[in-house]
Amino acid sequence: MGRPNVLIIKTNGNLGRRNPNTDAVLGKVMSAPAIEGGMQNGIVYPLASINDAIAIGITAAYDLANTLLAYHHINRFFTRNPNATLYLITAPQSASLADMTNITGVYVPVLLRAMAGKVKYVGVARNPAVGYVPVLAGGADSDVAAAVANAQALYDAEFAQFRYAGFLIEGRSFNGTAAAATDLRTLGCPNVSITWIADPAISGANALYNGYAAVGDTLGLISLAAVSQDAGELTPAFNLQNKGLGLFLTAGLSSNLSVNSYSDADLDMLNDKGYIFPDVTAGIDGFYISDSHTCSAIGNNDYAYIENNRTIEKAIFLARSAILPLVKSRLKADPNTGLLLPQVCKSIEATGNRSLGGMLTDGDISGGIDTYVDPNQNVLSTSQLLIQITFVPVSIGRQITISIGFSNPLKTS
């Protein structure tokens, strides 16, 4: 214990300094009425914390006055990951999910172009006006399916421009029947996911919120996960429930029903159909994202889960950034054959291998980085240089089987 004295404990981490991460730069697009002297529709706003949203007029009082969940979604996002950066653009309240994701529109496309590839993932949510009645199709608001198709078309167009950002769509107004639900695994949209998660404390706060889905919470947890990590990993950081903050004391779906209202068979069916919902695991307290499904088949598909896409997109970005200085550069050829000199090929291969070294260090890939430049390609004639890069990804243990039983040391046969 020592002699009586005044002891000093120097604390750290109290200044709220952020730990920025370029993987955790996300976008949020949602319908919400413009604010006089504050947030305007169609303008991109950078948000480093909920205080930046408050500064442009998006407050809890704004939500209450307009019967919407704009502040709520942003606040939940930063509650899940205070170190993330969120770029926000809003549309008029009349805009649908399909409108916001339209490839010729002025919302998601404008955000992605304005950020020039910095935004890595985008959440899209709808705050319908009072009186809105969804048209149900395939077990949900028909607007959801239309937005999924639009988002995939937009992803493909953006990919061609070297901007890589996947999509999370708000799965509004699930009709509560697993059998009637569309099989999302048949939609052929590997870069789009839908969240059907809902916090019943929010769903039940107003009739207009009955069909909402927790885009803010889900997007925040995706941003918190490493690119190779399932955002439903069963570790405390990814627990939807936070009793201290009153988050997800219970859990439900956008059907306005508790997850406990569904049988195990129903939940298994929804999981097999690619639905993201709050799951309960025996032996672990709280609720976790069921899985990181995309709207695409599992078989013969490398991109059936969100982390598959985030990993390959980061690898593409890093490799391209490393190789870009070679564009229009001089590549020496053998004066006798006209083919690239061996040392030129080896130098390019070393550059490609180094580009993914950080991902190996961070644990986002397993290794096996291999860059290959065919020494027999005729760059003199074609002006085209072909480079192949491969690596071994990390695996996710979705089904773990344990064989366990008694042993008897006296048993001889």
Where are the regions that the model predicts?
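Long, contiguous, structured domain-core segments that constitute the functional module of a protein
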Residues: 225-344, 391-413
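Conserved, well-structured core segments that form the ligand-binding/active-site neighborhood
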Residues: 120-265
